[in-house]
A protein has these predicted regions:
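Thr-biased low-complexity repeat/linker tracts and other Thr-enriched repetitive architectures
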Residues: 1-150
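Long terminal segments
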Residues: 147-159
Length: 159
């Protein structure tokens, strides 16, 4: 593991394996960064959050709570992943997007713009949630489905 630049690891946080933390990134609390994961830029990983595998958290992104980001997932821009949210596979969460609650974003799904995915919602396969769209409750958005604009999906399947 490497921690360099102005990066900081504090509290009971731990960085190990081939993980990299650099730039002005902050890893603290009980957070773990491991495997080949990278945390860089001004990103923060804190609370009990896990970032592992080949995941990349960068820019001004924040991953917190009991959330985890793994696989080849990327969280960047001003994106927030918090509570118990999970981002994995080749998923991307970026822009000002938020993923929270017990929500999951996986496979090659993308959540971006000012979109919000929360509750027990799942966004997976090649699905996209963008603009100011909200996906929540027990909603599942999958396949090549796109939810955008000011749309709200609070239950059921879209795929």
């Amino acid at each position: 593991a490497w921690v360099y630049g102005n990066a900081n690891v504090s509290g009971d946080a731990w960085v190990y394996g081939n993980a990299l933390v650099y730039g002005n990134a902050q890893v603290y609390g009980n957070a773990l960064v491991y495997g080949n994961a990278k945390v860089s830029g001004d990103a923060w990983v804190f609370g009990n959050a896990l970032v592992y595998g080949d995941a990349n958290v960068c820019g001004n992104a924040k991953v917190s709570g009991d959330s985890w980001v793994n696989g080849n997932a990327q969280v960047y821009g001003n994106a927030l992943v918090f509570h118990d949210a999970k981002v994995f596979g080749d998923a991307k969460v970026y822009g000002n997007a938020e993923v929270s609650g017990d929500a999951e974003v996986s496979d090659k799904a993308k959540v971006y713009g000012n979109a919000q995915v929360f509750g027990d919602a799942e966004v997976f396969a090649n699905a996209k949630v963008s603009d100011k769209a909200k996906v929540y409750g027990n909603a599942q958005v999958f396949g090549d489905a796109e939810v955008s604009g000011n749309a709200e999906v609070s239950g059921g399947l879209i795929g």
